[in-house]
Amino acid sequence: MVEMEQAEAQLSELDLLASMFPSENELIVNDQLALAELKDCIEKRTMEGRSSQVYFTINVSLDLSEAAVVTFSLSCILPFKYPTVLPEITVRSVSLSRSQQTQLNTDLIAYLQKNCLGDVCILNATEWVKEHAFDYVNIEALPSPARQSTAQPEDLAFTRLWIYSHHIYNKCKRRNILEWAKELSLTGFSMPGKPGVVCVEGPQSACEEFWSRLRKLNWKRILIRHREDIPLDGTAGGMEGQRKFPILEEKAFSVHGARGNHMDFGQLYQFLNARGCGDVFQMFFGVEGQ
């Protein structure tokens, strides 16, 4: 299978997945720039200029018992030669221990190697997880709904951090932002390019841990441009009610510039304004959005 056929197969599969998982939280394209590159290369009939692998997440909620609904997240990275080679898929769930998660992923890879090599297989992988997830979860160890609804005592404040960076290009840094936010149950968005913008929101302790990790990476310049701290009553409902973003995803707004690294700030402002954050635009850039 030649490069163009591989790229077209990837895009066709993404279109299929979008129709199978229409909800905003079911299919999340974590790397919008990579998807834009893929579409552009197919349109121009050349693979020149393609630098990033498509990266997305599928969230599947399963009723494993009358009292337990467990969410499994499939983080999927499509190598340039996929589907000739297998995708990189990692399944995660807060309901799995480390050993359970490792075993599930090992068994999934073995299934894909045996049955799907050479064909698109993300949907097959998702169906396999739906069918076999029960085998890896200890139902009795799952927290009760009452315990799930209560926040930890230290998370009595909701925090939203608006982080400014001179630029965000590095693929490892961009992946860290997405994976750390998911690990820490933070929502928001990340806008790569020059300048780079990251917004994370959630429990105060989680936001501070995210910032502690992020600032330790090698940056030309990075700082918290604006911070919001909101006291809560200690319930998860109060925490969730403060969120302005359903997930944390990477956003690309009409990429332009010689290196394709500048975003359309008008679209960024519209995105922020639609979520009640339009006033932050002036704090960031010193001009009113429009």
Swiss-Prot record:
Gene3D superfamilies, per database record: Ubiquitin Conjugating Enzyme
Record-linked Pfam families: Prp3_C, RWD
InterPro entries from the UniProt entry: Phi-like (IPR017359), Prp3_C (IPR010541), RWD_dom (IPR006575), UBQ-conjugating_enzyme/RWD (IPR016135)
Record domain RWD: where: 12-136
Top-level taxon of the source organism: Eukaryota
SMART domains for this protein: RWD
Cited SUPFAM superfamilies: UBC-like (SSF54495)
PANTHER family hit by this protein: RWD DOMAIN CONTAINING PROTEIN 2 (PTHR15955), RWD DOMAIN-CONTAINING PROTEIN 2B-RELATED (PTHR15955:SF8)
Protein name (Swiss-Prot/TrEMBL): RWD domain-containing protein 2B
Organism: Mus musculus
Organism phylogeny: Eukaryota, Metazoa, Chordata, Craniata, Vertebrata
Name of encoding gene: Rwdd2b
